[in-house]
């Protein structure tokens, strides 16, 4: 009996000692040069840049979920488009005089070329493997009907021929030609309907989740990189030496520990705004966010999937904001082809698909509530659009699909809830608050913390966005000969523009296509098309893209 009692006592002491040791370990402060908050494509891309630029720097990545790339980067939570403005009509607005503005389209395309170069470089280094697992050639098409829309697309096509980035685009108003390009879109359509389409063969479908997983897997091979899953940031505090102490909660065992970091990047998607506010930096006070979700109709029926190989983008209906642009897309997800149609906007107060219903309320402060109200009043068309989308029935969504796929059958499609996107609202001296397009890097004056806010065009421009972040927070290092040489090795066109330089454009497209296993044929002479007669239009307000 005494032996049993002694044994039980020893076990109890051992367990208590183990528990005490665990608590002591939890209270220890870990030190790291760079802390990456969020396990998505932005953090993975920044970490990959820094691994080449400063291989000795230690890095820690924390992710709230139990695996990386499960929120916006997940292939099922976005449209998987390699956004390069080849088909997205909202990137080429019509000016008041009737002309077509291509400046934004050129900027979007230039940005995507940087991403292609970044990925190609990582393939050559062995960081990314099997390019077909994350990027595939899928032609990009614009498709419209009705005389005014046809005139617009014709004028858009003509305007884009001024840029070397859009060489190789084809234009047609012929039913049979368009049917050859996109059978699903044309079969069963009224043969008298006036239609037009453009097609660019070098479009891409991209699985950003797969890219993220492969980049992080490569980072994990280094001993000075640490990945902490099921880990949630609870607090950020600036220290006297300009470093940051970040409090992390382990969601599995309930322990809490601190990480002391010289630089913090908040790449947490929709959660970035709340964490930026938690940091207390003055720059955060200018921002608010408004969440918009998206749904897609999905078909995995081989009869549908094998009959469509393109991403086909339409034009927003009259009175609808550009964010409502519908598209029917070939996707390659989980190793197989599917077809998606949408997006249909949804509303939730969550900032993440796996977020909290309190996200919107908890991010609203005395400094950003007025800008939010001003934006609501100034963008009433957007408010009406969101309300109408939330009210859509199953029949309404199917009717929208049939506009792009006249012979669609309900039984071939199911509804899928994609990710959440937080649109940026920024304080404005004149208007009180404005809805900001695109993404924005927000950092403190010392360059010790930075966050990425916004949604469009999202993951497809992760490489140029993180390049911009490097220039903003590591300006002195970026200008050094060492960093300059490394950055130009990663992105050969770094520091120059491809637009207007045919030889440079073709060289980079040929290089990235070969490495990434993509289709690329030297462009032929542009199609000759009749000149479009566009009527002058009242100037349009820019509206944020849903970025799905």
Curated annotation (Swiss-Prot):
It comes from the Bacteria. SUPFAM superfamilies: FAD/NAD(P)-binding domain. One of its GO terms (biological process) is tricarboxylic acid cycle. GO terms for molecular function: 2-hydroxyglutarate dehydrogenase activity; L-malate dehydrogenase (quinone) activity. Residues 539-548 have a biased composition (Basic and acidic residues). Residues 522-548 are annotated as: Disordered. Disulfide bonds: none annotated. Its cofactor is FAD. Belongs to the MQO family. This is Probable malate:quinone oxidoreductase. It comes from Escherichia fergusonii (strain ATCC 35469 / DSM 13698 / CCUG 18766 / IAM 14443 / JCM 21226 / LMG 7866 / NBRC 102419 / NCTC 12128 / CDC 0568-73). The gene is mqo.
